[in-house]
């Protein structure tokens, strides 16, 4: 064991060796050791708000001491500014700030890493020191702050030092505060919740979009992460161009937090362009400063949540009351009518004079392929005069029965019946009612299966998204309207979810209405009611049930989408929008063509193809011309193929098994017969007009997409569906009026309500409060304040109105042909 003199000599050996180095001066270290004994030394008596200049090198280090006092109830902070004229990254000026509980250090020039290994170096750096809080128990808190300035430069590096006290460090409620920040001069401030405030919204505004910035909210802890590379390590944060907003609950320790503002060295995170850097070590000082305004305002109280929730429920429950009132009025009117003949006298007296049950005999001389009908039937008269066969006199005794083809399958051959010039509903409702009803029930059961398998993974995914947002604090994951996003529990925007309640409630109400009609129709069939069996549009409710389920699922999936709306889950609710539009078109077609509608399997397979194309369009449709060429070709060809099937009532077939060019001869013959030989007037004029207009609309969509290539491909595809649906509905109503059919008051009311509500809904839809097509910061530029009850924004109103408009649209389809319930099916034209 070493004795004491030898141990003391060994401990002093490093200092002796340092003193023996030629040219080395130990004076700064000596001054540091003598600071308490030399009152004239600047390391002891440094003052706030005074600029200190100096040179540091390998042999010189300067230490400044500042005395800072904190008083109870007052939170003050200190800010250190360091500037260096040197741009040598190999020998930067090193700054170390020592406080009572922490150490903060940085270098000047301060480097920032950008994309693709770009480097941005700043010669002027300002940092705010973590404040110390004095309590009433301890009284004023006095502490020393040491600022060490050093460098390893062999020839010295110049610097300037300024230490100031921040006068306005604590933000106040409803008071705007203006300041400036840059990448090397971040800012943060303190906010403490007032006693009567449970939640607040931090609103940050800037007049210019760039430079890109980040707003962060962090717990009161040191160090504060206020640089670009570490601001995402703690708290809640979001990128910003012109505005940002963060809603916070009163669940922070000591009910206070830091609001941190960081300017990014590059703008790519906010959608900006790259900066061209000529010199690898180029320094940046004032080029990326940004003026900001921050205002912290109280958010809505809990009573607003309750009031808004009750408002949403009662608004849509009023529809239930309205439907009950309509049912009661109809019931009372039905009870007042006499039993005998009452059904026809009130709603269809104009047709009852000639309407009677279909007989089993066929009038002599009826046209080839005609249905069984009485001599007074307009359908028979039109078929006999325009059917294309020569007209024979019914009284011509020279006509032998053997002159006619009496094959028994003539009256059931689809190729004969569906190619007649004038078709009536009885021609296309010849199949067994039970079989057809089961066929349409498949739509209902299939959509339930699709909904379950579709919704469960969606719910799991959005819950994962919300969990990631809550755990990481990264609010750039979801594209909310942050100026009107009211959290509840783990949900960040409860108001966007609540506003979808209307789809579910109105969808369920529509199912109840359809169920009532279905039960009444079944009772009529069980009672052998002649009007239920042979009059009016055949009642098949499978598609209506499917539409009701689709409306409910639209609400569920829209709510799931709004849990965390972003680029990855937009198709959650748009998928059922496509299905709703498609089901409505199928229902319109099925009304007058009950026997030849598409099967549920092919219909849902078509929807799957549409959704697949939509996803591909969102991924590839922004810049790839080849996708638009392929999609436009598919769109045009699909329109032509569907038009052909509709024009020929599904009876157009080409024998592809003929290998000696028979397919082309068949196509040429059809073209010659229907387009050239009869060019003066198509065989089916009404259908031809509809299909020409429909093809022009679809070709216009295809041409528009090919030329302009819209970025929002999902909305573009939805526009195609909606325009086709509106076109078909308008054609249906026009043809109905042209056929001298009536539109009862209830469907007239539904049509008017549908038009008015859809117009209002589309106004709010196009407000564009956010958009996942750009960056999160660009999306926040479109954010706006709440407009209804201080709780709902424009998009929430779109949810309310669109649910109502869809409900009325469904009622239009359900009630439009109620006037035909007293008209024989062989008198109802097909169009």
Curated annotation (Swiss-Prot):
Look up keyword Ribosomal protein and say if it applies. Answer: no
The way it spans or sits in the membrane comes to: Multi-pass membrane protein
Query: Which residue ranges run through the membrane?
Result: 309-329, 442-462, 494-514, 541-561, 572-589, 600-620, 626-646, 688-708, 715-735, 746-766, 796-816
What processes does the entry annotate via GO biological process terms? Answer: RNA transport
List, as start-end ranges, the regions of compositional bias called Acidic residues: 397-408
Keywords per UniProt: Glycoprotein, Membrane, RNA-binding, Signal, Transmembrane, Transmembrane helix
Q: Which residues are glycosylated?
A: 67, 83, 136, 281, 470, 566, 768
Low complexity composition bias: residue spans = 374-385
- Topological domain spans for side Extracellular: 20-308, 463-493, 562-571, 621-625, 709-714, 767-795
* Domain of life of the native organism: Eukaryota
Q: Report the leader peptide range.
A: 1-19
In this entry, the parts of the chain located on the Cytoplasmic side of the membrane are: 330-441, 515-540, 590-599, 647-687, 736-745, 817-831
Listed GO CC annotations: lysosome; plasma membrane
Stretches for region Disordered: 354-408
Asked whether the keyword Glycoprotein is assigned, the reply is: yes
Record's subcellular location:
Membrane
Q: Which GO terms describe its molecular function?
A: cholesterol binding; double-stranded RNA binding; RNA transmembrane transporter activity
- What is known about what this protein does? In vitro binds long double-stranded RNA (dsRNA) (500 and 700 base pairs), but not dsRNA shorter than 300 bp. Not involved in RNA autophagy, a process in which RNA is directly imported into lysosomes in an ATP-dependent manner, and degraded.
What is the similarity comment for this entry?
Belongs to the SID1 family.
Q: Can you say what this protein is called?
A: SID1 transmembrane family member 1
Source species of the chain: Rattus norvegicus (Rat)
